[in-house]
Amino acid sequence: MNRLIIVFIVVTMICAATALSTKRRINKEEKDEKRSVAVAGAVIEGATLTFNVLQTVLKALGDISRKIAVGIDNESGMTWTAMNTYFRSGTSDIVLPYEVPHGKALLYNGQKDRGPVATGVVGVLAYAMSDGNTLAVLFSIPFDYNLYSNWWNVKVYKGHRRADQRMYEELYYNLSPFRGDNGWHNRDLGYGLTSRGFMNSSGQSILEIHVTKA
């Protein structure tokens, strides 16, 4: 009888431990799923990158006059590894998603400097691609729309190169940036890649880019 009681207790403890482990795993999966839906800093399925997702990322920043949500879909056949973001003005509390495999999309955001300051959010982000080159993306949301407009750009640089002031100047002034005009624009990036991107004209902007094999 005592042996039966001991066996019963052991089985009960094993079942309870298994149930607890399963519950924790399910909770973790639910949290990961929620995070992958529309959170800046997340990597999501490329096919799910939409305007609605970016609007959710943008809304999470709160009531800020100059802000941007960025989504970049990797259909290049390569893996991207984050290098850095260079801000000409503005900032972000989000770390660039470190690794973006083929078929996935990264979500990122930026905002004007905090406080009553007359700045926009302008910067460049850089990703090292597994072929040894660099994907660079420019976003520019000005403070004063009497003088400036929204602009964006995308380029593949040969070799690995971090984002900096020089890269910003090249992409903004010299390499035919696209105006944020509420329309789609296509570009041959070279190296067997092409891009399709959209930016709106608002001070609370979204930038959606798809990088695919040519």
Swiss-Prot record:
GO biological process, one term: cytolysis in another organism
Motif (Cell attachment site, crucial for protein stability): 179-181
Protein's UniProt name: Cytolysin tenebrosin-B
Site feature: Important in the initial contact with the lipid membrane: Y148
Top-rank taxon, per record: Eukaryota
Residues given in the record as phosphocholine binding sites: S89, V122, S140, P142, Y168, Y172, Y173
Site positions per UniProt: Interacts with the lipid membrane: R179, S195
Pfam entry (one): Anemone_cytotox
Ranges where the record places region Trp-rich region, which is important for the binding to lipid membrane: 140-155
Organism field: Actinia tenebrosa (Australian red waratah sea anemone)
Role: Pore-forming protein that forms cations-selective hydrophilic pores of around 1 nm and causes cardiac stimulation and cytolysis. Pore formation is a multi-step process that involves specific recognition of membrane sphingomyelin (but neither cholesterol nor phosphatidylcholine) using aromatic rich region and adjacent phosphocholine (POC) binding site, firm binding to the membrane (mainly driven by hydrophobic interactions) accompanied by the transfer of the N-terminal region to the lipid-water interface and finally pore formation after oligomerization of monomers.
Subcellular location: Secreted; Nematocyst; Target cell membrane
Segments of this protein annotated with the region Plays an important role in the hemolytic activity: 38-47
Domain notes: Composed of a long N-terminal alpha-helix and a core region rich in beta-sheet structures. Before the pore formation, the alpha-helix binds the lipid membrane, partitions into the lipid-water interface and stabilizes the monomeric molecule on the membrane. Finally, it traverses the bilayer, thus forming the transmembrane pore.
Propeptide position ranges: 20-35
